[in-house]
Amino acid sequence: NGFKRFLHNDLLALERAFCQNTGPHVVATEGVFSMDGDSPPMAELVALCQQNQAPLLLDDAHGLGVVGHEGAGTMSSQGLENAQLQCLMANFGKALGAQGGFLAADAVTIDYLRQTSRHYIYSTALSPGYCEGIRLAIKACRAQQWRRDKLQDNIGSFRNMAQQAGIS
């Protein structure tokens, strides 16, 4: 049946989409939406996906390093475990200031992607030295809560100024 969209963070619309479309379903969403900085209600979304046997894929490019305990991302920020997802993916280019990214999933999913993803098959892996740089960026990110606190302060200040200027 192809891909179907549902309204932004509207779980009732997603539930209707499940009912109106037969066949297997897969749900993909962002953890933190870049335009507004809002997040889906992940506990409810996970439950709805489980109820409809729909794997949930979370792109946490804007959540990793920014929200959650030690910058662990959207699921952590909402008190949930990443294990409730079929796939968790993010890039290293936002909070970590690097290139590349990752996709975390169960062994069956990873094996399938290894065998069928042209971008994976025909690409060069990140070098060990580069991976060490990413590891150190993650270590620094986890240890520096003050940076996440300052970011949230800056976001709040910007929103207040935008509202006062009649922009929001």
Please place each PLM-identified region on the residue numbering.
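Residue-level signature of catalytic and energy-coupling elements of molecular machines
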Residues: 30, 59, 101, 134, ...
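Conserved active-site segment immediately N-terminal to the catalytic lysine
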Residues: 53, 73-92, 111, 115
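Active-site phosphate-binding strand-loop segment of PLP-dependent enzymes
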Residues: 3-58
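Conserved core segment of the aminotransferase class I/II
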Residues: 87-89, 96-145
